[in-house]
């Protein structure tokens, strides 16, 4: 995992998984941002799903559930997520990134 250096913010988002025959892939695999920058993470899934969640694991190992979003758009402060179930993808948007955003981000489907 990338470490915070000065005003740089390291995000690691590479996750490829297969659950019950559903392949899940995130992009980009690695992302380094300047503090204050915006970014988008994408989660593609190979089959229709009932549930989709976005998680953040901070550098101290704490796992945080960001969004439960099987479809539509939700926002929570500087973070928002959109899931388009019919096209089998979800997006996580981080606006005005801060050093506290550093960590591992991943989506989980069911």
Swiss-Prot record:
One of its GO terms (biological process) is adaptive immune response. It comes from the Eukaryota. Its main location: membrane. It is found in: Cell membrane. Residues 22-110 form the Ig-like domain. Residues 1-21 form the signal peptide. InterPro entries: Ig-like_dom, Ig-like_dom_sf, Ig-like_fold, Ig_V-set, TCR_alpha_variable. Keywords: Adaptive immunity, Cell membrane, Disulfide bond, Glycoprotein, Immunity, Immunoglobulin domain, Membrane, Receptor, Signal, T cell receptor. V region of the variable domain of T cell receptor (TR) alpha chain that participates in the antigen recognition. Alpha-beta T cell receptors are antigen specific receptors which are essential to the immune response and are present on the cell surface of T lymphocytes. Recognize peptide-major histocompatibility (MH) (pMH) complexes that are displayed by antigen presenting cells (APC), a prerequisite for efficient T cell adaptive immunity against pathogens. This is T cell receptor alpha variable 22. It comes from Homo sapiens. The gene is TRAV22.
